[in-house]
Amino acid sequence: MTQTLHALLKAVGLPVPAGVANATVTALTCDSRCVGQGSLFIGLPGERVDGGSFWPAALASGAAAVLIGEQAAAAHPPAPGDSVLVVPDPVAFWAGELASAFWQRPSMRMELIGVTGTNGKTTTTHLIEHLSQACGRPAALFGTLVNRWPGHSLTATHTTAAADRLQAQLAEALEGGTQVAAMEVSSHALDQQRVAGCRFSGAVFTNLTQDHLDYHPSMEAYFEAKALLFASPYLVGEGPRAVVNVDDPWGRQLADRLGERAWRCSLAHEADLTMADLRMTSNGVDGALRTPLGEGRFHSPLVGRFNLMNVLQAVGALLQQGLPLPLLLNALPSFRGVPGRMERIVLTGSAAEDHPAVLVDYAHTPDGLRNALEACRPFVRGQLICVFGCGGDRDRGKRPQMAAIAAALADQVVVTSDNPRTEDPGQILDDVVAGLPADAERQVEVDRAKAIALAIAQARCGDLVLIAGKGHEDYQILGTEKVHFDDREQAEQALRHWR
């Protein structure tokens, strides 16, 4: 892929300096280490250093031109004659728009559905991918666990990738035959303009509960970051293009703002998308799904009321893209779930009833933990045991809240470490335990492996152990180091030693 710098700048409405107008751009990157001959380097501000300060190194590495923001230019002024373009901040916006233009606007040549919210993004995007594929529409998935499209799969490092990589991946997905793409869109990505250059033909709001208040100054700011996805320039197209959970108070506020642009979905009230005649068992749920385009019977193997909302929103989003309801409902039974989301741990060669039930889930917020525990309760014949912790260097306010929820909904609580990061693990546990009632059945074990083993060792047949917080993650962050750690492996090992 090559383009002239003149064409790229003109495509996004930036002025074209005479000195570099005829330069040919062969690659676009925001990483100075990846600059080669003919690259356009865009210097982005970072947490510790401003990437714009690396413009001399980028030019020395052969960059055709460099683009930096006004703040970086003030700190590291380029000399007259340098191939450095200074643009208004935030430079991240221009990075996304230029990357999109360089790759020929890939998001506008597919049906890109963005999913945002505190909980439910991963399951909803996986559902959209699965249902699209089952309906004969090749699909891509961009999210917390994986970025994949036909013929390609790559473990994700962030919920939403940086703009230069994201646009390149969208272009590659398009080349691979993708027609529908489901993307998890985090509040950080929206606030930091990582999805600049994307045009979404559909958007889903799952819910908003306390999380990331170490980053956002308030819940209102957190909401407004999420709401950016549903406004120009991101959400495009005529007619209803959004699916919003109005059982959530923030969702009701968003739906009121969007008006006829949104389909409202609810499990509690009349809405555009609803369910009725529900029958829940350990094998999933059966019921009727009602939409503005008709209704039908469905079966889903997913357990838990919160998963019903994920199903409702995935079906609604794809209906808005023109997929037929009968095909979508027929495809639901074959969706088996997402790794680390209410994942059952069963020993090979052993019947499930021969040992305590063990589930691993990613629940790491107050609402997520409540949903997971409530989903478990109908299937517990004995005691419900909850193992959980809270991440370090993150929102401290949710720690006592999660403890109170665990104590209220579980019979026994084992408090342990999650990802302590650079915070004192003992202090994190103290913050959590402060939320436990004095009479709560609790044990505290800072070593997560020992805590999992302890919970499973004391469980009996008929009990259920929920290990919450890390889900699919196969690492633990201790200090600044990532070490291998997988709740599923630890649970399986503990089950092998269970009496």
Curated annotation (Swiss-Prot):
One Pfam family this sequence matches: Mur_ligase
Reported modifications of this chain: Carboxylation is probably crucial for Mg(2+) binding and, consequently, for the gamma-phosphate positioning of ATP.
Pathways per UniProt: Cell wall biogenesis; peptidoglycan biosynthesis
Binding-site residues for ATP, renumbered to this chain: G117, T118, N119, G120, K121, T122, T123
Record key words, sorted: ATP-binding, Cell cycle, Cell division, Cell shape, Cell wall biogenesis/degradation, Cytoplasm, Ligase, Magnesium, Nucleotide-binding, Peptidoglycan synthesis
SUPFAM superfamilies: MurD-like peptide ligases, catalytic domain, MurD-like peptide ligases, peptide-binding domain, MurE/MurF N-terminal domain
Main location class: cytoplasm
Catalytic activity annotation: UDP-N-acetyl-alpha-D-muramoyl-L-alanyl-D-glutamate + meso-2,6-diaminopimelate + ATP = UDP-N-acetyl-alpha-D-muramoyl-L-alanyl-gamma-D-glutamyl-meso-2,6-diaminopimelate + ADP + phosphate + H(+)
GO CC annotation: cytoplasm
Renumbered ranges of motif Meso-diaminopimelate recognition motif: 418-421
MF annotations from Gene Ontology: ATP binding; magnesium ion binding; UDP-N-acetylmuramoylalanyl-D-glutamate-2,6-diaminopimelate ligase activity
Gene3D superfamilies registered for this protein in UniProt: Mur ligase, C-terminal domain, Mur-like, catalytic domain, MurE/MurF, N-terminal domain
Cofactor: Mg(2+)
One GO BP annotation of this record: regulation of cell shape
Compartments, as annotated in UniProt: Cytoplasm
Protein name as it appears in the record: UDP-N-acetylmuramoyl-L-alanyl-D-glutamate--2,6-diaminopimelate ligase
Lineage of the organism: Bacteria, Bacillati, Cyanobacteriota, Cyanophyceae, Synechococcales
Gene: murE
